[in-house]
Design a protein with these regions (language model features):
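Active-site-adjacent structural elements that line small-molecule/cofactor binding pockets in enzymes
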Residues: 1-290
Length: 290
């Protein structure tokens, strides 16, 4: 059965993440996802993939792990996700600790959406060369896996290199939280099969998908499964999609395509604007879960 979640840029001017989380759980949503940007360089050289003027929530968003900790503290079952976390801008040892701590304290409710990012200047302010972001993401993710799974992890790569260490706590979920890849290039599916657990693309409407450069979701799901089997991975990859609006026909299509989780998009706004939308989204979700 398809699960339904919510995504919002958590900012200082929006409804508090703990308030949103409580309401999300009350309405029966399975998950809450929060995006990440540490900052946005004022030069604005890198064009926003959304095409229009970059919304201000991109440089006002809270740290997702801190905001999700607040959400975890007031809920019991709601899964807590990053949508997405920019691993390319984080120290892997520190991030492994943060992820494991939150997963442990939330009793195994974390979902780790990851990506390499699109803002070259933002990334380079963290010391990450934009052209090398994908190899760096790969090594940092593999290194975190080692820290979550091994008693004395060590890792020796081009970008991450450390001898045996002691690093606790381990995540509550064995092997760490599920890692969902937020990308849609032709390389995405092999990357998922190597070091992630599923695919989490951004939603595009049918017209956008049919245009040049649009994402073919059916093909993406099929290619992910094919790469998964070629790697000899056990089980099945997970398929989530985020940024969906209040469109019943779109949701029906995504469910039919085989997405395990559909994540509705909320504006970064005050409670009196955001919370009424939960009832609308919940009514749509109910049609596919009842």
């Amino acid at each position: 059965m398809t699960q339904f979640g919510l995504l919002m840029f958590a900012t200082e001017y929006a409804v508090a993440p703990q308030v949103l989380a409580q309401q999300a759980e009350m309405y029966g949503f399975e998950s809450l996802f929060l995006p990440e940007h540490t900052h946005i360089p004022a030069s604005r050289k890198s064009p926003w993939p959304g095409g229009a003027e970059l919304p201000k929530e991109y440089w006002h968003t809270f740290d997702p792990f801190i905001a999700l900790t607040m959400a975890a503290s007031v809920t019991q079952k709601l899964k807590l996700g990053t949508g997405i976390s920019l691993v390319t801008e984080r120290d892997p040892i520190l991030m492994a600790k943060q992820v494991a701590s939150l997963d442990h304290l939330s009793d195994g409710r974390l979902i780790l959406g990851i990506g390499a990012g699109w803002n070259a200047e933002e990334m380079e302010n963290h010391g990450t060369p934009f052209a090398r972001r994908w190899p760096i993401l790969r090594e940092r993710t593999l290194a975190m896996r080692e820290m979550w799974c091994q008693e004395e992890p060590e890792f020796h790569g081009e970008f991450v290199d450390f001898d045996k260490i002691w690093c606790y706590p381990k995540p509550k979920q064995a092997g760490g939280p599920p890692i969902l890849m937020g990308a849609s290039s032709r390389y995405t599916y092999d990357r998922i099969a190597e070091y992630a657990d599923g695919w989490m693309p951004i939603y595009q409407n049918r017209a956008r998908r049919q245009a040049s450069g649009g994402v073919d979701y059916a093909a993406g799901i099929a290619k992910t499964k094919e790469a998964w089997q070629a790697r000899g991975r056990k089980g099945s990859p997970q398929f989530s999609i985020f940024g969906v609006g209040a469109d019943r026909r779109a949701v029906a299509e995504l469910v039919e395509l085989g997405f395990d989780r559909v994540i509705f998009s909320l504006p970064s706004d005050a409670a009196d604007v955001v919370l009424p939308l939960l009832e609308k989204y919940a009514s749509i979700a109910h049609e596919f879960t009842s």
